[in-house]
Amino acid sequence: MMKQCARRQMTEPVFRVAVLLALCSLSIGVDVHQAQKTPSISSAALQRHKRDWKWDKLYAYEETRPKNPPEKIGKLENTFFSSSTRYILKGDGAKDKFGVTDNGDIVVLAKLDRETQSVYNLSASLLNIHTGELVDKDESFVIVVLDINDNIPVFDSDQSGSISESSRAGTTIMKVKATDADDSSTENGRIDFKLLNGTDLFKIKPNGDLIALKSDLDREKQSQYLIAVQAKDMPEHLTGNSATTVVTINIKDINDNIATFKKERYQFTVKEDLKPGSEIGLLEVEDKDEIQNKDPTFALQSKFNDVFDIKRTKEKDGMLSLKVPLDYEKEKTHKFIVIVEEHTVSRTPDNKGLLKRTEVIIDVTDVDEPPIFNQTEYTFSVFEGPFKNPVIGAVSAKDPDSASYKIRYTIEDANCPVDVDPVNGYLSLKRTLDREQESLYTFQVTAHEDVLNGLKSSTMVSLKVLDINDNAPELTNGSYVYVCENDKPNTIIGTIGASDKDENSGRFRFTLARKSSNFSLYDNQDNTATIVLKQGGFSTENSEEYVLEIEIADGGTPEQKSVNLLQIKVCTCQSGRRVEYCMSYARTGMSVSALLAILLCIITILVIVILIVLRRRYQKEVLVTKASGEIHEQLVRYDEEGGGEMDTNGYDVSILSSACHDSSFRPSVGPALYAMVKKPPACKGDMAMMIEVKKDEADRDRDGIPYDTLHIYGYEGTESLAGSLSSLDSSSSGSNLDYDFIHEWGPRFRTLAQLYGVDGSDSDSSY
C-alpha cells in the first residue's frame, strides 16, 4: 500500500506567515502519515483489500530561487515500492519545475511565477525499472503556487473625466481604475487610492470614485484640473507597492454668461447704390461661454426694422444688412440703437450689468445713379385694327441725383410695333396690329441721361392686343357631308359647324345663301347645322356636282358674315350609311391667290421683254453713232511655220487644210458681211486679188497652219451688246487718217506701210 505525506502550507494573512513556517518545519516527520491496508487471513483464502489514496494540495511560494539540494514540498509512499521500482512524475512542470527523488520526495527545481501559472496538475506513478511496466496505476495531485507582493498597481490608460460647471457638491466625476497582478484575495492584490493634490475641491473613495467637493466650479475661471492620484496595495500597512498617475478633470461649459457688445458705437459707410440684401458690417459681441452655449438675439429700434436687418453669424455675432435701397438725397446719415439679449441663460449670469446696448451710425455716400422709372413694369392694352389715336400710354423716369439731368427715351428693338417719344415718353403705335397674328408684345424702353456718357436704365413694357370682331366665320366639318344612293327623303346626311378666329364669338347662325331643290339646312341653335335630304334618287353615275352655298353669321359687333361652298358627294353606301365608294369631281375652278400669282408672272415676263427690246434699240443707236476713230481692226498673224502645240491640240490640221480639195466643204458664196473700205493707196496690186492668192496658197499647203487662222474683223453685226470689235471703220469713206509715219518704222513694217500708204487713188475695193 502507498502512503503519502505532504507539507501543508495554507494561505493565510501575512502576519501569520512566520507561525506557518515554524509549524511546517516541525511537520516534516509529523505530517507524514501512513495508510496501510493490512490483509486479513482467513482459513478459506488470502484476500487483498482495495487501496485508498488520499492526496492533499501541495504548496510552493513563487519567486523562490532554486536551492541545492532542492526544496522539498512533499513525499510519495507506496507499499509496492522497492529497490527495483522508482517514482515518475507526469503533468504540468514535471522534470523542469518539479521532480521526485529516488525515495519519493517531491522537490522544486525552478523559480515559479504565480502570475504566469498559479496551479500545476501532476500525476505520480510507480514503475518497475527492469521490465518498464507500471507497478500501480497513476494517481493525480495539485501543486498551488503561493503569492508574494511582487507587483505594483497599474492604472488604466485613459484617466480623464468631466463635470459641468456649477454642479452640486458630491457629484461623482469619474471612477479611477487600477489593477494589481497579485492575488486579489490577499492584501497583496488589494488597492487603495489617495489624492496627492486638489483635496480642497475633490476627494476619492477607496473604490476609486472621484467626487467634487464644491459647487462653484467655473469653467470661465479654470476649465481643467490635473489631479495626482496614488494607488497602493497592502492597505492599512506602511509597506506595500504604489503607483501614481495624473487624472484630467475637464469642466464642461453651460450658458451662464450673457453676450455683450465689445464697443459702445459701431460706424459704417455705405454707398447709396448698395443692393438690398447686401451686408453692411459686423457687430461683434463678447460671450465667455463656448460657442454652442451662446444664444444672443439682436433687436433694432422699431422705425429702422424696415430699412436694416441683423442676422446671427456662425460665430454668434450680429451681421447688419440692408433691406431697402438707401437714398443719399433723402437722408445722408442713419443712427439707431441695437440691443443684444440672451434668454437661455441657465442661472443668474456671471457678467450681469455689462454693455448690452450699442449705437450704430451709417453714413450714406452719394453715387451717380441711373434714371429710375416710376414703375418696375408697364402694361398697356390696345384694340387691334385701324386706330384713330396712336398713343397707347407713357412711361416716366427721373434722375434721382441732385443734378437732375434731363431724360431721353428710346426703344432699341427695330421690329417693335411701338415708338416712344424721346422727350416725354409717350408710346404710340407704328402700324396696325392684328391680334390673330400676335396677341402680346413685350419690349424694353430705355431711359438715359441727356449728357455725355450719361447713365441709363431700362424697364419692360407689355402691350396686350384686344380683339375686335374683324374675322368672318368659317365652315367646319364639311368633309363629312355626303349623300348615299339609297338615302330617302328627310334623311340627315351630315352636320356642319363653324369657327371664328376672334375671341368670345357669339352664337353662329346658319342659312342657305341660295335655295336648293335637293337639300335643306336646319340651324340647331348650338353653333351647328344639319343638312337634310329633300328627295332621293341620287346615283354615282350622274356626273352632276352638288354644291350648297351656306351663309354663316357670327352675331358679333359688328356682325361678320361669310358664304361658304359645301360640296356634297354622292356615294355608294352599305347598311348604316357606311361609305363604300364616292364619286370624285374634277375641280375646274381656281383660287383667287392662284389667279393673282399667274397674273403677276405674266406682267413680270412682259416687263422683261420690253426692257430687252429697249436695250437693243439703244445699242444699235450707239453703234451707228460711233466715230470712225473708235472702230479699230485687229489683225492676227502667225509668222512661224505652222501652229504651236496649243493650236494643234484642239483640231485635226489635215481635215482643216483639206477644205480646198473637197468642193463639198467649200463655203457657199453668200452676201458680203463686211463693210466696204478704201483700198490702200500705196498698194500696187488689187487687194482683193492678193487676199484670194494668199488664201489659195494656204489651202494647198498641208504643212502650214489652217486657213482660218487669219482673223479679220470688219464688222460684227448689231446683235452684240458689247458693240463692234473692229479696229477700222471699213464702211466709212473719205478717211482723214494719215499713215505715212509707218514708213519711218523701218523695213520690217514695209508691207504694213504699203497697205496703209496713200497713192492718190480714191477707188474702193471690197474684201
Swiss-Prot record:
<feature type="binding site">
    <location>
        <position position="182"/>
    </location>
    <ligand>
        <name>Ca(2+) 3</name>
    </ligand>
</feature>
<dbReference type="GO" id="GO:0061300">
    <property type="term" value="P:cerebellum vasculature development"/>
</dbReference>
<keyword id="KW-0732">Signal</keyword>
<dbReference type="InterPro" id="IPR015919">
    <property type="entry name" value="Cadherin-like_sf"/>
</dbReference>
<keyword id="KW-0325">Glycoprotein</keyword>
<feature type="binding site">
    <location>
        <position position="233"/>
    </location>
    <ligand>
        <name>Ca(2+) 3</name>
    </ligand>
</feature>
<feature type="domain" description="Cadherin 4">
    <location>
        <begin position="374"/>
        <end position="475"/>
    </location>
</feature>
<dbReference type="GO" id="GO:0002040">
    <property type="term" value="P:sprouting angiogenesis"/>
</dbReference>
<dbReference type="GO" id="GO:0120078">
    <property type="term" value="P:cell adhesion involved in sprouting angiogenesis"/>
</dbReference>
<feature type="binding site">
    <location>
        <position position="115"/>
    </location>
    <ligand>
        <name>Ca(2+) 1</name>
    </ligand>
</feature>
<keyword id="KW-0037">Angiogenesis</keyword>
<feature type="glycosylation site" description="N-linked (GlcNAc...) asparagine">
    <location>
        <position position="518"/>
    </location>
</feature>
<keyword id="KW-0479">Metal-binding</keyword>
<feature type="domain" description="Cadherin 2">
    <location>
        <begin position="155"/>
        <end position="261"/>
    </location>
</feature>
<dbReference type="Pfam" id="PF01049">
    <property type="entry name" value="CADH_Y-type_LIR"/>
</dbReference>
<dbReference type="GO" id="GO:0016477">
    <property type="term" value="P:cell migration"/>
</dbReference>
<keyword id="KW-0130">Cell adhesion</keyword>
<feature type="binding site">
    <location>
        <position position="180"/>
    </location>
    <ligand>
        <name>Ca(2+) 3</name>
    </ligand>
</feature>
<dbReference type="GO" id="GO:0120077">
    <property type="term" value="P:angiogenic sprout fusion"/>
</dbReference>
<feature type="binding site">
    <location>
        <position position="147"/>
    </location>
    <ligand>
        <name>Ca(2+) 2</name>
    </ligand>
</feature>
<dbReference type="GO" id="GO:1902354">
    <property type="term" value="P:blood vessel endothelial cell delamination involved in blood vessel lumen ensheathment"/>
</dbReference>
<dbReference type="GO" id="GO:0007507">
    <property type="term" value="P:heart development"/>
</dbReference>
<dbReference type="GO" id="GO:1902355">
    <property type="term" value="P:endothelial tube lumen extension involved in blood vessel lumen ensheathment"/>
</dbReference>
<dbReference type="GO" id="GO:0000902">
    <property type="term" value="P:cell morphogenesis"/>
</dbReference>
<keyword id="KW-0965">Cell junction</keyword>
<keyword id="KW-0165">Cleavage on pair of basic residues</keyword>
<dbReference type="Pfam" id="PF00028">
    <property type="entry name" value="Cadherin"/>
</dbReference>
<dbReference type="GO" id="GO:0005509">
    <property type="term" value="F:calcium ion binding"/>
</dbReference>
<dbReference type="InterPro" id="IPR002126">
    <property type="entry name" value="Cadherin-like_dom"/>
</dbReference>
<dbReference type="GO" id="GO:0016525">
    <property type="term" value="P:negative regulation of angiogenesis"/>
</dbReference>
<dbReference type="GO" id="GO:0007043">
    <property type="term" value="P:cell-cell junction assembly"/>
</dbReference>
<feature type="binding site">
    <location>
        <position position="150"/>
    </location>
    <ligand>
        <name>Ca(2+) 2</name>
    </ligand>
</feature>
<keyword id="KW-0812">Transmembrane</keyword>
<feature type="transmembrane region" description="Helical">
    <location>
        <begin position="594"/>
        <end position="614"/>
    </location>
</feature>
<feature type="domain" description="Cadherin 1">
    <location>
        <begin position="86"/>
        <end position="155"/>
    </location>
</feature>
<comment type="function">
    <text>Cadherins are calcium-dependent cell adhesion proteins. They preferentially interact with themselves in a homophilic manner in connecting cells; cadherins may thus contribute to the sorting of heterogeneous cell types. Required for embryonic cardiac looping and heart chamber development, via promotion of cell-cell junction formation and subsequent attachment between the endothelial and myocardial layers of the heart.</text>
</comment>
<keyword id="KW-1133">Transmembrane helix</keyword>
<feature type="binding site">
    <location>
        <position position="113"/>
    </location>
    <ligand>
        <name>Ca(2+) 1</name>
    </ligand>
</feature>
<dbReference type="GO" id="GO:0008013">
    <property type="term" value="F:beta-catenin binding"/>
</dbReference>
<dbReference type="InterPro" id="IPR039808">
    <property type="entry name" value="Cadherin"/>
</dbReference>
<dbReference type="GO" id="GO:0045216">
    <property type="term" value="P:cell-cell junction organization"/>
</dbReference>
<keyword id="KW-0677">Repeat</keyword>
